[in-house]
Curated annotation (Swiss-Prot):
Keywords on record: Chaperone, Cytoplasm
Annotated InterPro entries: PFD_alpha_archaea, Prefoldin, Prefoldin_subunit_alpha
Protein's UniProt name: Prefoldin subunit alpha
Family statement drawn from the similarity comment of this UniProt entry: Belongs to the prefoldin subunit alpha family.
Gene Ontology biological process terms in this record: protein folding
Organism domain of life: Archaea
Length: 148
């Protein structure tokens, strides 16, 4: 009986650790999806910019709290794109779109790996819970034995 209780404590601890890891992975997955959506929006914006015939189109520049300023795109053939670590480079719109497509593929890979890891953790959580339940059932059955 004491051995069973120690095993249950161990399983409970393992379950808590796995739950914490799963929660972190779920949060990471959410952040990856948000970042991917932002990159997708930028890519679509650049693709739409290419379709505009005006040389210097007028735009609305967001300044926060749902407020905007009117602006003019001075150079619609080039975009300044973040390359990470606080650095940005100027690229042609076509190059910027290609760069963003690569970044989207990287996000897709990271999302897929994170989903797989989360699925694996959820399976392990189920296995640990099942094992704990089996031990509890054995303990319950042991206490109901009829003596002759």
């Amino acid at each position: 009986m004491a051995q069973s209780n120690k095993e249950l404590e161990k399983l409970a601890y393992e379950y808590q650790l796995l739950q914490a890891q799963a929660q972190l992975l779920a949060q990471n997955l959410e952040l990856l999806n948000l970042a991917r959506a932002e990159v997708q929006t930028v890519k679509e914006t650049l693709e739409n910019l290419k379709k505009i015939e005006e040389e210097k189109p007028e735009i609305l520049v967001p300044i926060g709290a749902g407020s905007f300023l009117k602006g003019i795109i001075v150079d619609k053939n080039n975009a300044i794109v973040s390359v990470g670590s606080g650095y940005a480079v100027e690229r042609s719109v076509d190059d910027a779109i290609s760069f963003l497509e690569k970044r989207l593929n990287e996000y897709d890979d990271a999302i897929k790996k994170t989903q797989q890891a989360l699925t694996e953790l959820e399976k392990r959580l189920g296995d640990v819970a099942k094992k704990a339940q089996e031990i509890q059932q054995k303990q319950a059955m042991g206490s109901f034995k009829v003596k002759k």
